[in-house]
């Protein structure tokens, strides 16, 4: 079998003009769109959790759900290297200033996902010691309802956030007023990259030997 890394039709030949070669190898776009596309596909979550919902958040990092498919596999242990924080669990009054301090240390631009009923609105804890919604002291980009939400719900919320970043949603227009509904969670099917790229891999039957590249 012959090995080839590029399709024959896209390999420059002596008969092609410079314009034809450039058109096949260059992508023209706006710098803002390119940066937004890069940011949306390389979100770095901060490894931070508060309560029960963090268990579901951590489950999304496992191989079964594989959040790395959406470019968020680089889990950061420090807020100074993260640009996404998921408020997952009950926000107690004692933790509110700690969360705000962690948020202030994150890189700009930064995004916040509010995960679970307790983080969204206090949940069942309508008491003096629990903040009735993290949006009382943080700007929230996306709300994921549930008690607790499933990992699929968090990943679906992540895809919605990615689309908002790609579309260039202004940071000043927060919150985005976007709440995931149970119907959307149920209808959301986890993307299977293996099946999506199956036909593409099957067609790649001509590869160039490494010593001839």
From Swiss-Prot:
Binds 1 [4Fe-4S] cluster. Keywords: 4Fe-4S, Cell inner membrane, Cell membrane, Iron, Iron-sulfur, Membrane, Metal-binding, NAD, Quinone, Translocase, Transport, Ubiquinone. Its EC number is 7.1.1.-. Belongs to the complex I 20 kDa subunit family. One of its GO terms (cellular component) is plasma membrane. NDH-1 is composed of 13 different subunits. Subunits NuoB, CD, E, F, and G constitute the peripheral sector of the complex. GO terms for biological process: aerobic respiration; electron transport coupled proton transport. It is an enzyme of class 7 (translocase). Its main location: membrane. [4Fe-4S] cluster binds at residues 52-53, 118, 147. Its cofactor is [4Fe-4S] cluster. One of its GO terms (molecular function) is 4 iron, 4 sulfur cluster binding. It is a peripheral membrane protein. It is found in: Cell inner membrane. It catalyses: a quinone + NADH + 5 H(+)(in) = a quinol + NAD(+) + 4 H(+)(out). NDH-1 shuttles electrons from NADH, via FMN and iron-sulfur (Fe-S) centers, to quinones in the respiratory chain. The immediate electron acceptor for the enzyme in this species is believed to be ubiquinone. Couples the redox reaction to proton translocation (for every two electrons transferred, four hydrogen ions are translocated across the cytoplasmic membrane), and thus conserves the redox energy in a proton gradient. It comes from Shewanella woodyi (strain ATCC 51908 / MS32). This is NADH-quinone oxidoreductase subunit B.
